[in-house]
Structure formats: structure tokens, C-alpha cells
């Protein structure tokens, strides 16, 4: 069985077309992602959605909207970093965190920022979230 195509880069390679020529509609608004949004989609470690042999991504506007709605509708609780490390019995660096604002997967450096700034980690829909460095910088 072939490996599923999960990134825009893999999609462009499998179709043998240049990355910038990939037309990828947003799963939510159906507008095509810009080249910058396609790059961010892969950089944020998001995965393509396949439905009826059609492929969809997620534009930045919809990613932020979905993230906000998820937080408002499905927020469970917040933890201090030592609490979440104790609950999961793993250090924060081994725990997957996504940005609460833009859904980017947090890097090691961003996780260390969460620790050094004494920020809280939120459980939303049984997933752990905190702010990435860009969203923290712009306070959005």
C-alpha cells in the first residue's frame, strides 16, 4: 500500500508539477490557498484532507477561525507546565503542542519559551495547545 500524501510538497511531487502550480482549495471556505499559505501549511505540519478523491488544505484565515472556535467551544482546562509534565509523565519537549491561535506545531524553541515565560498549556478537544512565538509576538 502506498504512503498517503499528506503535504503539499508530496502532492506536487506525486503529480510531477511545480509546487507553485498546485491548486489547493481550503477545506472550509473553498478558496484556493496562496503560495505563501501552501508553504505555511507544510511548515505548520498540517495534513491534507482527502474526500471523494479530492484534496483540501486550510487557508490561514480559516485556520485561525477554526482554532478560535475550537477554543471557545471545546476548551477543557489549563495547566502549568510542571502539572502537564506530571500528568503525562513526560517532559514538555516530548509532548506535542500546537498553537492555540494558528494551529502550528510548536518547535522545541517555542516550547522552551512557554516554559521560560511561565505560560499555561491548554487542553482543547483533548489536544494540548499554547501560543507559538509569532502569535505571542503579535499578541493575537
Curated annotation (Swiss-Prot):
ZnF start-end (unnamed): 26-62, 99-135
Top-rank taxon, per record: Viruses
Transmembrane residue ranges: none
Gene Ontology CC terms: host cell cytoplasm; host cell nucleus
InterPro entries attached to this UniProt entry: E6, E6_sf
Assembly: Forms homodimers. Interacts with ubiquitin-protein ligase UBE3A/E6-AP; this interaction stimulates UBE3A ubiquitin activity. Interacts with host BAK1.
The protein's name: Protein E6
Lineage summary: Viruses, Monodnaviria, Shotokuvirae, Cossaviricota, Papovaviricetes
Gene label: E6
Amino acid at each position: 500500500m502506498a504512503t498517503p500524501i499528506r503535504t503539499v510538497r508530496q502532492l506536487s511531487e506525486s503529480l510531477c508539477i511545480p509546487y507553485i502550480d498546485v491548486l489547493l482549495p481550503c477545506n472550509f471556505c473553498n478558496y484556493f490557498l496562496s503560495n505563501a499559505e501552501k508553504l505555511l501549511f507544510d511548515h505548520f505540519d498540517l495534513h491534507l484532507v482527502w474526500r471523494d478523491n479530492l484534496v483540501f488544505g486550510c487557508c490561514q484565515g480559516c485556520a485561525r477561525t477554526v482554532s478560535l472556535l475550537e477554543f471557545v467551544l471545546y476548551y477543557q482546562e489549563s495547566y502549568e507546565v510542571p502539572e502537564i509534565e506530571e500528568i503525562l509523565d513526560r517532559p514538555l519537549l516530548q509532548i506535542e503542542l500546537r498553537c492555540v491561535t494558528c494551529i502550528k506545531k510548536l518547535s522545541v524553541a517555542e516550547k522552551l519559551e512557554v516554559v521560560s515565560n511561565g505560560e499555561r498549556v491548554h487542553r482543547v478537544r483533548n489536544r494540548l495547545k499554547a501560543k507559538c512565538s509569532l502569535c505571542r509576538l503579535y499578541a493575537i
